[in-house]
Amino acid sequence: MGGFFGTVSKTACVADLFYGTDYNSHMGTKRAGMVTYAEGMGFMRSIHNLESSYFRTKFESELSKFKGNSGLGIISDTDPQPILINSHLGKFAIVTVAKVNNIPELEQDLLASNMHFSEMSLSKTNQTELIALLVIQGKDFVDGIENVFRKIKALARCSS
């Protein structure tokens, strides 16, 4: 399982991001990550293993290094996230909480299209990177996200 939290604000968002992501800590115990974006500075990212400690313990001392008005936080039981991508669409950060059921098929299609995978987890394709590669196949972000929905076969699940 896992959970993510995102925020875009007119003011600094780091505290909201930290507490919003921490709120999802019960959703997973393997890894956590945060990324913020500040105009003129770019992305600031940190990823930690949570198997021996809590989210707050790992990230609280780093909060001063994060700047910006937008950010993503993730609690993941699968891949280290967030990942940063630089593509023809521009630079972006991405997180996922998903169960992609057709990774081998998508992996073959992307490799046949001269794409590559650089984020491997336990010798398996990182599903977040796979989804990012599907996004960047689009002419813009909207087209790329629609491409993800067209190609991925996944288990849809909602929780409250």
Label every PLM stretch briefly.
Residues M1-S160:
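Conserved short alpha-helical segments that host acidic/polar catalytic motifs at enzyme active sites
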